Amino acid sequence: MATFQLSGLPSLQIENQTVGGLGLPTVPQYAERPNTGVMLAQGLGAISERLEANKQQQSEADFMKSLGTAYAANDRDAMKQLAAAHPEQIERIQKGMGFIDQDRNQMIGQAAMDLRLAAKRGDQSLIASLQKNVPLLGQFGLTPEEVFLSYKQDPQQFDKMTDLIHLHADPKSYFDVQDKQEGRNIDRNKLAETERSNRAGETLTMRGQYISGANALTAAYAPTAAMQNYRQYAEMLQSDPDAAMAFANAAGINTVSKKLMKVEKNDDGSVTKYYTDGSEETGKINQPIAGDGIKPISLPHAQSIIDKANEGSKKAAGFALRLKDSMDSMHKLGKKIDTKRVALINRALGEGAIANLSLSPVEQQYMVNARDALYAILRPETGAAITLPEMQEYAKMYLPQPGDSTLATETKMKKMQGQYNALRGQSGRVYDALVVSSAAYNQRLQSDGRYTSKSGIQFKVE
């Protein structure tokens, strides 16, 4: 039997050394040996863990490959099925990307969608969206400047990145948006097919009218920011009225006036008219369409006037329409701007898009419309590319400047109104026709999807 000697304690050594001769059996000494059963169990466990890890890695790889293939093919149904069948994979990806809870995931998904849609509307819209999402970008260690530069360097990669972030952060919201877009595409396709079958005999006539209307718009560089905002506002009114009102407030849309935004042709041959005050009116296609600031005119009559008008009248109407939209938005937004920041707003005119990041969203919207207004005034006078010095000089003539009195500011707005009146007078009835026709262009021609002007108005030009 083993014995131990601990310091300070009596020895446990057997003192009677003759005890062995007493015929007592010797206690056997056992050496510690490996437990084969335990070792085998541990080995099998390790192998099982490795197999399970390999299986998990393979499952993750298969999922990512399948999802990537479905995404590349724009197969929304396949992506939905994968997400529904493998929620654990979505959760794993979310945790890996720092998406830690449902509320945060929804915020990230919404921000990604906002940035993606804003980028499609142009630099100014993207800048406004980046400014709005500064706190969320900061949580990822990003600045608006960095994100904006990444977009400018590779717009397609930016579009893909924001789309995938939305997909992984909030799959439900992502697929809801995709379904709504698909629904709109289906509706547009049905409308297009109905028009093709019912109006095949009028194809050549309508084609000539489309081209004539498109030329009038492009020749005058029809409204950009304002037209995009009106179109988006009209769509939001149908899907989310509360959000539409918030958007109108931010974009400088006067929801009290009854300004015509959109004319939509229905399957039964009637038309629905949408106005900025949120009202809708349905009538026959030959029924005159009214709106604030225009004399009532039917859609066919409007197209006929544009088709017969000379280029000078078309251009004057286009510039007048652009100037009017910009002035309306400037008037609405100007009430919200701190006059102490007017100097900064005016300087931003020549400092490029990055400088605008220092402006508030309302000031950015104001500047977008101010630029459009100056272009509408300058373009008819110069007939050529507009230089920065020209823009700066005209800004002093028509926009508020540091030190301007209230009377001086009012005088400048009257001068801008005078420019609009002159253009309106040159255009004659073509202006009314263009207001109605341009409101109908976007809806009717989107189904063909041939071309998008700088204003966001889509049409076919051959």
From Swiss-Prot:
Q: Which InterPro entries match?
A: Inj_translocase
Cite the entry's keywords alphabetically.
Viral genome ejection through host cell envelope, Viral penetration into host cytoplasm, Virus entry into host cell
* Pfam families, per the entry: Inj_translocase
Q: Looking at the keywords, is Cytoplasm present? A: no
Indicate whether Transmembrane helix appears among the record's keywords: no
A Gene Ontology BP annotation from the UniProt entry: symbiont entry into host cell
Residue intervals passing through the bilayer: none
Positions of disulphide bridges: none
Q: Which residues form a coiled coil?
A: none
Q: Report which superkingdom the organism of origin falls in.
A: Viruses
Its annotated function is as follows: Component of the phage injection machinery. Required for injection of the phage DNA into the host.
Similarity annotation: To phage P22 gp20.
Kindly provide the name given to this protein in its UniProt entry: Putative DNA transfer protein p33
- The gene from which this protein is expressed is 33
